[in-house]
A protein has these predicted regions:
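Active-site catalytic microenvironments for nucleophilic, acid-base chemistry
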Residues: 3-7, 51, 55, 212-216
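Active-site substrate-recognition segment that forms the wall
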Residues: 19, 35-36, 46-165, 169-184
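C-terminal lid/capping helical subdomain adjacent to the catalytic/cofactor pocket in oxidative enzymes
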Residues: 9, 177-235
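Beta-strand segments within the central parallel beta-sheet cores of soluble alpha/beta enzyme folds
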Residues: 14-17, 161-163, 222-227
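Helical element adjacent to the flavin cofactor pocket in flavoenzyme catalytic cores
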Residues: 1-39
């Protein structure tokens, strides 16, 4: 956002969108702080992308999928680098072909071990995947499952205190792939549904989205990410 601002973009922060309507070939975006006219709109609102989509008559199949993080006390160096188990990917994609030998609660809450040290000598423990609407409250049962899985890989963690937990929401799609696409509503684009990969994929998403809006051919095949794959029953 700061880079875009340097190029002349105007940021309008903490300004809720209340509605979108057509005015000729342009959109009029109704916000809490007035109206904004735009030729094109990119819906990059993550778990709230469906809310914006409904304003132009689109049903965007994105759900909120909650994930929790545990934060340890300051302690000795348990590990120097980030570690995650293969189960992180199988839980994300809900693989039927691979089942881990894990406890019922680890399986129930989509828990997979992720460890990340910090510069302050705390460490972060993840991860979980549950459907809880837009609830971002931490669950003690999920925390227990995450601690159980962490101790399975690093037994020393059993002797280290957890000082807090927090949760966030990932934008989930039925086929676990993002939507990076134009739509039947001319000038309305979607860039959402990346689930836990949004930060890492943001540069390439921005590049191909800019190409689409400019009428240029993206350098890669985006057909697997098209919005209409859901309408066609392909997902």
């Amino acid at each position: 956002a700061l880079g875009a601002e340097k190029k002349g973009a105007v940021l309008s922060l903490h300004n809720r969108v209340k509605g979108i309507r057509r005015d000729g070939n342009a959109f009029v975006i109704e916000t809490e702080n007035g109206e904004i006219a735009a030729k094109n709109i990119v819906d990059a609102c993550g778990v709230w992308a469906p809310v914006i989509g409904k304003m132009v008559g689109l049903d965007i199949p994105i759900q909120a999928r909650q994930g929790q993080i545990l934060v340890s006390e300051q302690t000795f160096q348990v590990a120097r680098r980030k570690v995650h188990e293969f189960g992180y990917m199988s839980t994300k994609f809900q693989s039927d072909g691979y089942k881990r030998p894990v406890s019922e609660r680890v399986e129930k809450y989509g828990v997979a071990f992720v460890f990340e040290p910090t510069a302050s000598n705390n460490f972060l423990i993840g991860s979980s995947r549950t459907f809880a609407g837009e609830d971002t409250r931490s669950s003690i049962e999920v925390m227990k499952a995450m601690a159980e899985r962490a101790i399975r890989f690093f037994p020393v963690i059993a002797d280290i205190k957890v000082i807090r937990s927090y949760s966030g929401l990932r934008p989930y799609t039925p086929d676990h792939m993002p939507i990076v696409s134009g739509t039947p509503v001319e000038g309305f684009y979607i860039a959402a549904g990346h689930e836990g990969d949004g930060i890492g994929l943001s540069p390439i998403t921005g590049k191909v989205m800019a190409d689409m809006i400019a009428g240029e051919e993206p350098f890669m095949d985006l057909s697997p990410l098209k919005f209409d794959r859901f309408a066609a029953g392909q997902a």
